[in-house]
Structures are given as structure tokens and as C-alpha cells.
């Protein structure tokens, strides 16, 4: 089972919008995750701990990014944006294996962008 966590041990139930970019030679890439009203921002979640990063966890292990930012509207948290950077083809392949598992577990689909 593939899960996303912001506080270790607490699974995030909100499904993110994920945008991928990749260099032309395939050596690097970026995944931007946008969560609208994630569970971790609810008041009772703060009792469980602080957000220390975004953890992508599956049977192979975990991928971690510390590039996590909250989005506020009128002083209240409304969303989270996290950026995961892949610095090699191996990192990209590992990330895609995680996303395949996460997609299967959550009924997501992949839509390739047009090159126009």
C-alpha cells in the first residue's frame, strides 16, 4: 500500500493534484503536489505532531522532501504545496513506481500534457 504522510505515522487522506516536469534528457525531474484542505491542517491534527516534510511511503521504502509550504486564505490554512525533486533517472524511475502504486490504491489516472 502506498501512502503520503506529513506527520510520520499519520496518513493523509486527501488526494493531491500532482504535476510532473522532466528535463529533455530525462536526467532530472520535479513533482509538485497540491493538497486542497488536507486533513493534516485540521486543528486536532496538530496534537499528533508537527509537519516535518512529505513522506511518500510504499513497500520499497520512503521518499522524502522537506520542501513543504502551507497556503493561507484570510489567515486560515487552505492547502499544502510540496515539491519533490528527482536528480537522476533512477530517482525518476523510483518515484514513478511509487506513483503507480499510489494511483492504483486511490483510483487516479495519468494524463500526459500536450507538447504545443
Swiss-Prot record:
Predominant localisation class: plastid
Regarding the membrane, this protein is recorded as: Peripheral membrane protein
Q: What's a GO cellular component annotated to this UniProt protein?
A: chloroplast thylakoid membrane
Q: Which GO terms describe its biological process?
A: photosynthesis
Q: Which UniProt keywords apply?
A: Chloroplast, Membrane, Photosynthesis, Photosystem II, Plastid, Thylakoid
Task: Specify the domain of life of the species encoding this protein.
Answer: Eukaryota
Subcellular location(s) of the protein: Plastid, Chloroplast thylakoid membrane
The record's section on NCBIfam families has: PS_II_psb28 (TIGR03047)
**Family membership noted in the UniProt record:** Belongs to the Psb28 family.
> How does this chain assemble?
Part of the photosystem II complex.
The identity of this protein, by name, is Photosystem II reaction center Psb28 protein
Q: Which organism is it from?
A: Guillardia theta (Cryptophyte)
Amino acid at each position: 500500500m502506498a501512502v503520503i504522510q506529513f506527520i510520520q505515522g499519520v496518513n493523509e487522506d486527501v488526494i493531491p493534484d500532482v504535476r510532473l516536469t522532466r528535463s529533455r534528457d530525462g536526467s532530472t525531474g520535479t513533482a509538485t503536489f497540491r493538497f486542497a484542505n488536507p486533513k493534516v491542517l485540521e486543528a486536532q491534527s496538530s496534537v499528533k505532531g508537527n509537519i516535518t516534510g512529505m513522506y511518500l511511503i510504499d513497500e520499497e521504502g520512503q521518499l522524502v522532501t522537506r520542501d513543504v509550504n502551507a497556503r493561507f486564505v484570510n489567515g486560515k490554512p487552505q492547502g499544502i504545496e510540496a515539491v519533490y525533486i528527482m536528480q537522476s533517472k533512477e530517482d525518476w524511475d523510483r518515484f514513478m513506481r511509487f506513483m503507480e502504486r499510489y494511483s492504483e490504491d486511490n483510483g487516479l489516472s495519468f494524463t500526459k500534457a500536450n507538447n504545443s
